[in-house]
C-alpha cells in the first residue's frame, strides 16, 4: 500500500515513540521505506490533538503517542475512536500497570527521559572538566570552575574534584608550592568559589611517607620532611588569607566526608 503514514504524537520531543514505531516497521519487509513517519512534538493542547486526528482520518493514518498526562491521553483516545482512526498508546498502559503493581504514583511530567539524559551529560561534562583542569595544569579553568580547590600536595585535591564532579560541579584544583607563585586567576575570582584544604603537619608527614614507600622510595626524602611540610603549610595559610576563602580541615576526614562539606558550603553560598 502506498502513502502509508504514521503520526507520532508526544508531549515531549517524541524520540521514544518514533523509535518504537521504527522498530515495529522493521519487522515488515520494505515497510520502513514505504511509510512516512510524521512527528508531532510538544503537544500541550487539545487543538493540536483535534488537528492530528483530522489529518489521520483524511489520509488513513495511524496515531502512535506518548502522552503522560492522563487527561491528554484520554482526550486523544476519545477523539480517535469517534473518528474511527487507529491509534496506539505506547507509554500509558505501562505507566498504569506500574502504578497498580508497585503502589506508586507517577509524576506525569513530560520529558522526564530527556531530563535524565541532560543530567547524565552534565555529570560527564563535569568529570571531563575535573580531568582537564586537574593539578593546576591550565589556569584558565579557574575562571570557568564552580569550585576551586587549593592545597599542598597529598590533601586529596584530585579525588575530591572527581567526587564533586559526580555531583555535577565543575571543579579545578591548584597545588600550593612555596617555590611557585599561584596563578593570578586565583585572586580575580569570587573568593566564595575557592576552598582551601588544610591538614595537620603530622598527618601530612605520615601520608607522604606512606606515599614514598608505595613508590619504593626513601621516606627520608625532603618531600616527607616535617620542616619542609611546615614551610609548605605556612605558605598555604598566607595564600588562603590573601584570597579570603573558606578552609576545610581534611586531616582526619574521608574524601566523601570532605566532599559533602564542600558541597554544603557551595549550596549554602549560592
Swiss-Prot record:
This is Putative pyruvate, phosphate dikinase regulatory protein. It catalyses: N(tele)-phospho-L-histidyl/L-threonyl-[pyruvate, phosphate dikinase] + ADP = N(tele)-phospho-L-histidyl/O-phospho-L-threonyl-[pyruvate, phosphate dikinase] + AMP + H(+); N(tele)-phospho-L-histidyl/O-phospho-L-threonyl-[pyruvate, phosphate dikinase] + phosphate + H(+) = N(tele)-phospho-L-histidyl/L-threonyl-[pyruvate, phosphate dikinase] + diphosphate. Keywords: Kinase, Nucleotide-binding, Serine/threonine-protein kinase, Transferase. GO terms for molecular function: ADP binding; ATP binding; phosphotransferase activity, phosphate group as acceptor; protein serine/threonine kinase activity. It holds the Pfam family Kinase-PPPase. ADP binds at residues 151-158. PANTHER family: PYRUVATE, PHOSPHATE DIKINASE REGULATORY PROTEIN 1, CHLOROPLASTIC (PTHR31756:SF3). It comes from the Bacteria. It comes from Bacillus velezensis (strain DSM 23117 / BGSC 10A6 / LMG 26770 / FZB42).
Amino acid at each position: 500500500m502506498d502513502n502509508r503514514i504514521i503520526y507520532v504524537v508526544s508531549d515531549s520531543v517524541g524520540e521514544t515513540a518514533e523509535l518504537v514505531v521504527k522498530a515495529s516497521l522493521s519487522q515488515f519487509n520494505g515497510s520502513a521505506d514505504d511509510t512516512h513517519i510524521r512527528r508531532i512534538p510538544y503537544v500541550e493542547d487539545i487543538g493540536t490533538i483535534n488537528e492530528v486526528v483530522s489529518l489521520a482520518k483524511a489520509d488513513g493514518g495511524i496515531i502512535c503517542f506518548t502522552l503522560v498526562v492522563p487527561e491528554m491521553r484520554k482526550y486523544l483516545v476519545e477523539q480517535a475512536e469517534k473518528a474511527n482512526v487507529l491509534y496506539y498508546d505506547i507509554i500509558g498502559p505501562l505507566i498504569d500497570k506500574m502504578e497498580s503493581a508497585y503502589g506508586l504514583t507517577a509524576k506525569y511530567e513530560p520529558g522526564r527521559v530527556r531530563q535524565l539524559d541532560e543530567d547524565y551529560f552534565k555529570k560527564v561534562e563535569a568529570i571531563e572538566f575535573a580531568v582537564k583542569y586537574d593539578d593546576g595544569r591550565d589556569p584558565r579553568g579557574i575562571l570557568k570552575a564552580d569550585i576551586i580547590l587549593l592545597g599542598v600536595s597529598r590533601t586529596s585535591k584530585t579525588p575530591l574534584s572527581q567526587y564533586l564532579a559526580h555531583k555535577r560541579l565543575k571543579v579545578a584544583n591548584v597545588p600550593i608550592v612555596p617555590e611557585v607563585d599561584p596563578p593570578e586567576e586565583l585572586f580575580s575570582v569570587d573568593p566564595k568559589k575557592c576552598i582551601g584544604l588544610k591538614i595537620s603537619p603530622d598527618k601530612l608527614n605520615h601520608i607522604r611517607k606512606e606515599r614514598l614507600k608505595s613508590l619504593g622510595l626513601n621516606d627520608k626524602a625532603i618531600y616527607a620532611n616535617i620542616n619542609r611540610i611546615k614551610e609548605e603549610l605556612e605558605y598555604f595559610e598566607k595564600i588562603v588569607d590573601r584570597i579570603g576563602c573558606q578552609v576545610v580541615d581534611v586531616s582526619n576526614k574521608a574524601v566523601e566526608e570532605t566532599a559533602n562539606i564542600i558541597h554544603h558550603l557551595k549550596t549554602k553560598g549560592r
